[in-house]
């Protein structure tokens, strides 16, 4: 899917992150890490409130959707309300858990309880129920919280040609499993883009992905197995990749009823 709220795989996130632009974006810090910088929001301000909440006020830059319409704060309000709405059934809804009103939305289905607003066309305001150190770096840069237009064609998520996007690249062609995206003339940060055209190939066959890479028919792939890498160790250069693995133990299962066993597993 190319619906920001519904993405779950790395490949989906990569494509969505090139087609859409969030409030903030990540760039290289020149030392192997990343830093947060302005994206669709040209600036922001953070206020600590007396009740312990925090309010972020984002001022949007002048950006256009791929159909020429202006990107507004209302587009972010709609996208974030839609993400939190239990009716959307997004697997990424918990990204907004720190936003005030999130739990009320989840229990009632009333998206108006989410503390996000657009007091002006270019002003997006978010109130957090408490401080969140990763709000800017992980929530405001995430694929799932990208802006979404409320008026879209039916089944737009499954039809790349119907997508209305605001990012650095816009879809120019969708043919035979290949999605071609080019940089629009109106994009504000063209000078930093190293490629004017990207071609995404959707290939579910792992062996075919490896073959395409070996033949230099693609520049980048996801999902190579350890077995494939071990076959030609001199071909690949390993690099670190940040990842968190979680093991959830069903304590109600008879086979895991022993506390000593669970402690041994940890």
Where in this protein do the model-derived segments appear?
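N-terminal lobe/hinge region of extracytoplasmic solute-binding protein
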Residues: 1-51, 164
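Short, solvent-exposed loop/turn elements at domain surfaces
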Residues: 1-6, 26, 31-36, 67, ...
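Solvent-exposed, polar/charged alpha-helical surfaces in well-ordered, non-transmembrane soluble domains
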Residues: 17, 21, 42, 74-82, ...
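Sec-exported extracytoplasmic/periplasmic mature domains
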Residues: 24-28, 81-89, 131-133, 140, ...
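Aromatic- and charge-enriched surface segment that lines or borders ligand/interaction sites
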Residues: 42-95, 125, 255-257
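Surface-exposed binding/hinge segments that line
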Residues: 70, 75-77, 88-149
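Gly/Pro-rich hinge or "lid" segments in bacterial periplasmic/extracellular proteins
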Residues: 122, 128-197, 207
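Extracellular/periplasmic solute-recognition and catalytic clefts
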Residues: 172-180, 199-255, 264
């Amino acid at each position: 899917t190319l619906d920001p709220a519904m993405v779950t795989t790395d490949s989906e996130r990569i494509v969505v992150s090139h087609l859409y632009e969030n409030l903030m974006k990540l760039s290289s810090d020149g030392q192997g890490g990343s830093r947060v910088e302005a994206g669709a929001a040209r600036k922001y301000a953070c206020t600590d409130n007396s009740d312990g909440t925090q309010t972020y006020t984002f001022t949007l830059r002048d950006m256009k959707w791929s159909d020429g319409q202006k990107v507004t704060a209302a587009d972010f309000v709609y996208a974030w309300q839609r993400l939190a709405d239990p009716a959307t059934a997004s697997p990424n809804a918990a990204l907004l858990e720190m936003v005030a009103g999130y739990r009320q939305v989840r229990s009632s289905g009333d998206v108006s309880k989410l503390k996000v607003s657009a007091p002006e066309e270019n002003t997006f305001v978010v109130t957090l129920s408490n401080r969140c150190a990763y709000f800017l770096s992980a929530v405001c840069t995430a694929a799932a919280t990208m802006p979404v237009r409320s008026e879209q064609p039916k089944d737009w998520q499954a039809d790349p040609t119907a997508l209305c996007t605001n990012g650095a690249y816009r879809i120019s062609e969708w043919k035979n499993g290949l999605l071609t995206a080019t940089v629009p003339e109106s994009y504000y940060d063209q000078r930093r883009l190293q490629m004017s055209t990207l071609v995404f190939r959707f290939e579910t066959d792992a062996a075919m992905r490896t073959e395409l890479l070996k033949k230099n028919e693609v520049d980048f792939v996801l999902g190579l197995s350890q077995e494939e890498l071990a076959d030609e160790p001199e071909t690949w250069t390993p690099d670190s990749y940040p990842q968190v693995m979680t093991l959830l133990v069903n304590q109600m299962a008879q086979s895991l009823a022993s506390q000593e066993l669970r402690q041994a597993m940890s």
